């Protein structure tokens, strides 16, 4: 399948089949001010970095994609499966500074226009949802905990229209080189999707898991047509020149920003 994320300055831009009012993308680590290492484009305020750096990077991205910072919404993610609907009243939340608002949220959606849903990632899976006929957009953060917690199915529970009208984009995340132990493997085997399709045993207490594939399987099992699910080939852990990787860089790294908005 042709890669739909096209590299631009500072971000990957998702290419739709038809003209659309939706903007969907994922930032890269290139050409910024942050020390991860020097000149990195970190987008997270919650790690050790200058607030000035983050604001500067936000301003750059805002100008590139046509969504001013006061239209952005950023929840505080906690690797859980809590979902919230956001509206125009949430615009600007946690953008200039972090607050207690939208804390513990790993999935959000809206039917309002002129809102940019944003979340930070550095190996976890960004899952974008949209339906042009229904004016709906959504974004979920699925690390191994969120994937095991089936956050994508929690997102689907909030959808009250036919899944034929729903499109899903699974963005850049770690490759199947992401290693888990027996305990985590056993957790995933509790799920009703076939674990042999996304987990590969490589040695004693060593298993590689394809989190992008697992989320696609969960969506298909829930009834989303496979033709409506796009999975990028980009892997954060395999492209350190382009992406931050929490696992590969042992936590000493920045964060990319996934975003989706509708004019």
UniProtKB/Swiss-Prot annotation:
GO molecular function, one term: S-methyl-5-thioadenosine phosphorylase activity
Protein residues bound to Zn(2+): 79, 124, 141
Cofactor(s) this protein requires: Cu(2+); Zn(2+)
Reaction(s) catalysed by this chain's protein: adenosine + phosphate = alpha-D-ribose 1-phosphate + adenine; S-methyl-5'-thioadenosine + phosphate = 5-(methylsulfanyl)-alpha-D-ribose 1-phosphate + adenine; inosine + phosphate = alpha-D-ribose 1-phosphate + hypoxanthine; adenosine + H2O + H(+) = inosine + NH4(+)
InterPro entries assigned: Cu_polyphenol_OxRdtase, Cu_polyphenol_OxRdtase_sf, Cytotoxic_necrot_fac-like_cat
UniProt entry keywords in alphabetical sequence: Copper, Hydrolase, Metal-binding, Oxidoreductase, Transferase, Zinc
Enzyme Commission identifier(s): 2.4.2.1, 3.5.4.4, 2.4.2.28
UniProt cross-references to SUPFAM superfamilies, sorted A to Z: CNF1/YfiH-like putative cysteine hydrolases (SSF64438)
Function (record text): Purine nucleoside enzyme that catalyzes the phosphorolysis of adenosine and inosine nucleosides, yielding D-ribose 1-phosphate and the respective free bases, adenine and hypoxanthine. Also catalyzes the phosphorolysis of S-methyl-5'-thioadenosine into adenine and S-methyl-5-thio-alpha-D-ribose 1-phosphate. Also has adenosine deaminase activity.
Family: Belongs to the purine nucleoside phosphorylase YfiH/LACC1 family.
Subunit structure: Homodimer.
Name of the protein: Purine nucleoside phosphorylase SE_0862
